[in-house]
Structures are given as C-alpha cells and as structure tokens.
C-alpha cells in the first residue's frame, strides 16, 4: 500500500508566508522599519534624506490655527520651500541665544522638581547654562552669544567659545513690562554681528560653520514689529542659518482675546521656509521639566538632525506617547 507523501508548499503559499511576516519594531537603528521597506532610490552619501526639507511641525504636531481670532495677523507671504541637501557634518556652530526679559518671565507659575513654584526666567537661565556647557563638551570650537530682548534688543555677550563668559552675563537680569516685540530689530542685530558662510557647492562641501539663533520667548499674543526685507529673506533661505524657538505661553484661550498663543506660535513657524528649524511650545503653568527637555532636544547639530516632524526620542514606537520622567542633557 502506497503512503502519500506530504505535499510540499507551493510557490504561492511561500509568497503568502513571506508577505505575512511582521515587520521589525521601529527602533533608533531601524527608524520607521527602514530595513523592512523595499529598497528604493538611495540618497547620496552625506546628504539629507528624503523628506527632511519638508516643513517641520512643533513637537509632535503644531497647533491648529484654523480657528484664529477676528483680527488677522500680518504673516509674511508664503515663500516657496527651499529644499537643499547639505553634508551632515558636525561643523562648528555659532549659537546666538536670545532670552526674553518680559515681565511674564518673572511670574512664579512653573512647577519645579521639588513641587514648589518658580518662574520661567530662573528655569531658562539654568537650562541655557546647561546647554552651553554641554555643547562645549561636545565640541570646544562652538561659539555662543547672549542677546536679551525687551522692548529693544541688547547684545550682552559677544561670540565666545568660553562658556564662563556667557554665563557671567546670564544671571542678575531683571524683567520689565514690554509693550512691543521688535522682531525685525532682533534679526537686524544678528545680521550686523554675524556673517553667513558661503560655499562653492552646498550639497558636497561642508561649511566652515553654521549660525543658529535660539529664541526663548514668553509674552501674551501680540503682532511683532516685523517686515520681511530682502536681506532677511536671504538669511532665512541660507542653508546654514537656523531659527529655533522655545515659546512659553499662558496656555489659556479667553474668548475676549483677539489673538491666541497659537497664532503667535504659527507666526514664528512661518518664518522658516526651509523646514529645518525646531519650534517648541511649553505652558507657563506646566512643569519646569518640559523646558529642560526642550532645550535638551536642541543639543543636536542642526545639520545632523532630521526634520522635526521626523524626530523621535524613544527606543520603540510604543513609547512615543510615554511621559518622560527626567531631562537628559
């Protein structure tokens, strides 16, 4: 009596098993399951990956500004996005830290690590010092400058590679009531004090340095004094200039207010036509830990970090929504 042999799997069944295999979880070494995707056209070595020139959203999603107040904001006309690939190198940075000294920075609303209330100015001073000293340990050729902003702007500390020089000007600062925010004056001062590098080939030749402005800002929503001049257009379109923002807002939306903090946050984001800058918003009545975490995320080199909407700070995808328990700097 013949015993029938077990039938071998057909080619169609093998293909179904291959397609049914679950992809690997998304990790730092395998972002978005990159190794499980079909091999496509690869970007050239040392260039930004596909999609990193897209407009960045603010920390896992920018606020929805569809319900703006009755008064329209004078937002700069939308310029075409400049998608330029640059070498992903750790060249020296010239970091200009702009600290707001409005009276909102002195309100004791932030919750400190021990549960007591503190103000945004004290927290900002500490996180700026930690940022400068950590960046200096990463690369001692980085340079830093401190600018304070109230009704006007003042350049307190020139570009220096010694963190002690900047930190000596960082404390003993006083806040004041501010009626306006002269954003145009701030950028004009930056243009006077710095010079943007120029290379023969942006895609292949690393720049000698990059210029990055970090604005720590906390004011009620108000239309800044700003007009986009031709020199400013060139500055924002330069692939070696970055404008990062940490916006500390009141977190409330009263009906009688014509403008919302979301309008101001969207205005700041509209200045970045390249999609390479990072923008964060933190509630003034929230934990001080959030401010430290935002500043820690800005430690990455702007030429080496991804578009903000692609940035992930967890090992696995399931941890994306987990609450961070400590600031890492």
Swiss-Prot record:
Positions of post-translational N-acetylmethionine modification: 1
Annotated region described as Disordered, given as residue ranges: 1-84
Keywords assigned: Acetylation, Cell cycle, Cell division, Chromatin regulator, Cytoplasm, DNA damage, DNA repair, Mitosis, Nucleus, Phosphoprotein, Ubl conjugation pathway
UniProt key word Transferase: no
Gene3D superfamilies: von Willebrand factor, type A domain
Bias type Acidic residues, positions: 10-19
Assembly notes: Component of the ARISC complex, at least composed of UIMC1/RAP80, ABRAXAS1, BRCC3/BRCC36, BABAM2 and BABAM1/NBA1. Component of the BRCA1-A complex, at least composed of BRCA1, BARD1, UIMC1/RAP80, ABRAXAS1, BRCC3/BRCC36, BABAM2 and BABAM1/NBA1. In the BRCA1-A complex, interacts directly with ABRAXAS1 and BABAM2. Component of the BRISC complex, at least composed of ABRAXAS2, BRCC3/BRCC36, BABAM2 and BABAM1/NBA1. Identified in a complex with SHMT2 and the other subunits of the BRISC complex.
Record text about domains: The VWFA-like region is similar to the VWFA domain. Its presence reveals similarities between the structure of the 19S proteasome and the BRCA1-A complexes.
The family this protein is said to belong to: Belongs to the BABAM1 family.
Protein name: BRISC and BRCA1-A complex member 1
């Amino acid at each position: 009596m013949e015993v029938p042999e077990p039938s071998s799997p057909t080619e169609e069944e093998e293909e179904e098993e291959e397609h049914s295999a679950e992809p690997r979880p998304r990790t730092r070494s395998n972002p978005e399951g990159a190794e499980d995707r079909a091999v496509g056209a690869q970007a050239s070595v040392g260039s930004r990956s596909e999609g990193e020139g897209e407009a960045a959203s603010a920390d896992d999603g920018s606020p929805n500004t569809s319900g703006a107040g009755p008064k329209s904001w004078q937002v700069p006309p939308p310029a075409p996005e400049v998608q330029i690939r640059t070498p992903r190198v750790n060249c020296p940075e010239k970091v200009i830290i702009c600290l707001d000294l409005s009276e909102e920075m002195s309100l004791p609303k932030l919750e400190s690590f021990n549960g007591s209330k503190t103000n945004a100015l004290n927290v900002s001073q500490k996180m700026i010092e930690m940022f400068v000293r950590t960046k200096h340990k990463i690369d001692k050729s980085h340079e830093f400058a401190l600018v304070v902003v109230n009704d006007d702007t003042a350049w307190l500390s020139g570009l220096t590679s010694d963190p002690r020089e900047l930190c000596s000007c960082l404390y003993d600062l006083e806040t004041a009531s501010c009626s306006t925010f002269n954003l145009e004056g701030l950028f004009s001062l930056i243009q006077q004090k710095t010079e943007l590098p120029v290379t023969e080939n942006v895609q292949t030749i690393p720049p000698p340095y990059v210029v990055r402005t970090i604005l720590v800002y906390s004011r009620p929503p108000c239309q800044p004094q700003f007009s986009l001049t031709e020199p400013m257009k060139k500055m924002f379109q330069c692939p070696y200039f970055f404008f990062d923002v940490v916006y500390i807002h009141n977190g409330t939306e009263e009906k009688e207010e014509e403008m919302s903090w979301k309008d101001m946050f969207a205005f700041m984001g509209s200045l970045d036509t390249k999609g390479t800058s990072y923008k964060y918003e933190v509630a003034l009545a929230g934990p001080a830990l959030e401010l430290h975490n935002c500043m820690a995320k800005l430690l990455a080199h702007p030429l080496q970090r991804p578009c903000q909407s692609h940035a992930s700070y967890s090992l696995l995808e399931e941890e994306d929504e987990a609450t961070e328990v400590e600031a890492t700097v």
